[in-house]
């Protein structure tokens, strides 16, 4: 839940600077998270049916579970990685003309959240990589669509020139 202030700030930033043009962007951002989460949680996890490392009997003595509990849901793919990479790639591809190199911070954020899933012992590295690839693909496709269908420009912020 520590990510909520960042995303609330981003939504306010977009609403203030892009006005009515922000609404398609916000809707597609929400759709991006919805698609990444649903495909990860309701398609891939049941299909692959891989247990989390914290439920693996062979690894139980070697896992340090920092949360104190281990979810009963399946492990592949990491929905956290899918969701955050979906959002990160979507933001990067739609707002990079305004944020330029600062756009990379959203990818760093997604990578940090994803690494955290391995660090706390609830995902294998390939779970996170699979989630990152899923999220990146969906985020990129959603950004392609919105960039073509709803061109994004702000009367308040000039695009950064290369």
Annotate the PLM regions.
Residues 18, 64-162:
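Membrane-embedded catalytic cores of phosphoryl/pyrophosphoryl-handling enzymes
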Residues 32, 46, 50, 91-94, ...:
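Short hydrophobic alpha-helical module
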Residues 1-9:
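The first (N-terminal) embedded transmembrane alpha-helix
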Residues 11-39:
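Interfacial segments of alpha-helical transmembrane regions
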Residues 53-67:
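Interfacial juxtamembrane loops and adjacent helix segments
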Residues 4-5, 41, 82-85:
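Membrane-embedded glycan transfer/ligation machinery
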Residues 34-54:
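Transmembrane alpha-helix/helix-exit interface in multi-pass inner-membrane proteins
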């Amino acid at each position: 839940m520590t990510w909520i202030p960042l995303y609330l700030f981003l939504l306010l930033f977009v609403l203030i600077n892009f006005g009515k043009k922000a609404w398609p962007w916000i809707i597609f951002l929400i759709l991006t998270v919805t698609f990444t989460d649903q495909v990860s949680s309701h398609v891939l996890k049941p299909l692959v049916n891989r247990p989390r490392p914290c439920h693996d009997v062979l690894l139980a003595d070697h896992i340090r579970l920092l949360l104190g509990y281990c979810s009963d849901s399946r492990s592949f793919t990491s929905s956290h990685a899918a969701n955050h990479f979906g959002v990160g790639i979507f933001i990067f591809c739609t707002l990079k003309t305004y944020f330029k190199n600062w756009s990379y911070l959203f990818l760093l954020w997604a990578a940090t959240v994803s690494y955290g899933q391995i660090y706390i012992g609830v995902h294998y590295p390939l779970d996170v990589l699979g989630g990152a690839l899923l999220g990146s693909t969906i985020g990129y496709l959603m950004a392609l669509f919105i960039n073509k269908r709803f061109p994004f420009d702000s009367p308040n912020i000039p695009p950064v020139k290369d």
